[in-house]
C-alpha cells in the first residue's frame, strides 16, 4: 500500500511548509541570512569522459572473457527464474564470476519477471492547510484561476528526475505544494532518460517541465531534454530547474533555454509565483 512512504512524504511536506513560513528556523536559509553570497569552490567533473572510460572498461571485459561460458551462465540464470527451480542469487554470482555485467545479469532476470514500475502519487492538503488564509498563498491561487480562465484549463507541470539521480524528496515536496496551489501535477518515474521525459511532457500536454537535479547531471541531461522537446515540436513547454545547481552553471542553462532556476532555500510559494507569472506573460 506504500503507507510508510506516503507518511514520510507527508512529514517532509509539513516540514517544508513550516520552513517556508519561518516557523521552523534554519539559520542562514530562512533566518539570519548572510548579506553576501559566499563563493564556493566547485570541483567540475567531466562526466562524459567518465562515462566513456566506463564504457571502454566494459568493452574490454567483454572482449577478454569467455563469452560462450558467460552466456551459458546467463541462460542458466534465466532458466532458474523461469522455472523457479534453483537459487537465483547463487546463479547470479556464478554469472558474475564469468564477468557478466550487472546490466546483463539484470536483463536475464528482467526477461522473466519484467521491470517494476512505481506509481507516483501526490499528497494533497498539506500546504493548503498550512497556508490557510495566508495572503501570499491566496494571491497565487487567484493567478492560477486567472490562467485557467485565459487558457481553459489549469497550469500543468511535469516534475521529473533525470538519469541516476534518485534523490526525490524535493521533487515530491514540490509536487505536493504545487497541487495544493492549484496546478495539475504529473510526477515522472525515477531514472528517466531525457528523451522519455520529453515524450511524457508531450503526451500529458503540460505547460511546464520542472527538473529536480541533485546529482550534478544538469549540464549533460538538460540540453538533451530541450533538444528532444524541439524534435517533438514542444518548444512552447517552459523548462525550469531546481535543486543543487552551482551558480556558475546558471548562465549555461539560461542560454540553452531554461527559463528559471531555483536553488537550495528557495521558498516554494515564491517559485510557484514566478512560474505562474512566466505562463501569464506568454
What kind of region is each of these model predictions?
Residues 1-139, 202, 206-207:
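Flexible, glycine-rich loop/tail regions that form catalytic "lids" or insertion modules at the edges
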Residues 171-281:
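Cofactor-cradling patches in redox/metallo enzymes
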Residues 155-157:
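Conserved hydrophobic helix-helix packing surfaces used for dimerization/oligomerization
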Amino acid at each position: 500500500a506504500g503507507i510508510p512512504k506516503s507518511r514520510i512524504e507527508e512529514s517532509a511536506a509539513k516540514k517544508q511548509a513550516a520552513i517556508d513560513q519561518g516557523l521552523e528556523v534554519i539559520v542562514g536559509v530562512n533566518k539570519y541570512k548572510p548579506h553576501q553570497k559566499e563563493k564556493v569552490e566547485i570541483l567540475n567533473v567531466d562526466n562524459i569522459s567518465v562515462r566513456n572510460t566506463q564504457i571502454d572498461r566494459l568493452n574490454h571485459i567483454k572482449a577478454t572473457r569467455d563469452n560462450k561460458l558467460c552466456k551459458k551462465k546467463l541462460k542458466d540464470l534465466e532458466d532458474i527464474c523461469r522455472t523457479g527451480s534453483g537459487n537465483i542469487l547463487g546463479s547470479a554470482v556464478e554469472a558474475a564470476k564469468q564477468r557478466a555485467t550487472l546490466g546483463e545479469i539484470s536483463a536475464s532476470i528482467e526477461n522473466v519477471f519484467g521491470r517494476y514500475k512505481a506509481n507516483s502519487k501526490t499528497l494533497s492538503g498539506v500546504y493548503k492547510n498550512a497556508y490557510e488564509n495566508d495572503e501570499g498563498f491566496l494571491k497565487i491561487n487567484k493567478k492560477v484561476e486567472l490562467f485557467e480562465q485565459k487558457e481553459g484549463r489549469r497550469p500543468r507541470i511535469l516534475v521529473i528526475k533525470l538519469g541516476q539521480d534518485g534523490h526525490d524528496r524535493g521533487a515530491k515536496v514540490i509536487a505536493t505544494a504545487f497541487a495544493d496551489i492549484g496546478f495539475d501535477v504529473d510526477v515522472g518515474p525515477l531514472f528517466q532518460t531525457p528523451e522519455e521525459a520529453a515524450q511524457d511532457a508531450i503526451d500529458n500536454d503540460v505547460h511546464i517541465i520542472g527538473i529536480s537535479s541533485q546529482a550534478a547531471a544538469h549540464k549533460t541531461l538538460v540540453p538533451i531534454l530541450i533538444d528532444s522537446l524541439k524534435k517533438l515540436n514542444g518548444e512552447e513547454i517552459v523548462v525550469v530547474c531546481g535543486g543543487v545547481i552551482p551558480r556558475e552553471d546558471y548562465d549555461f542553462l539560461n542560454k540553452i533555454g531554461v527559463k528559471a532556476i531555483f536553488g537550495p532555500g528557495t521558498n516554494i510559494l515564491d517559485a510557484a509565483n514566478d512560474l505562474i507569472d512566466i505562463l501569464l506573460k506568454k
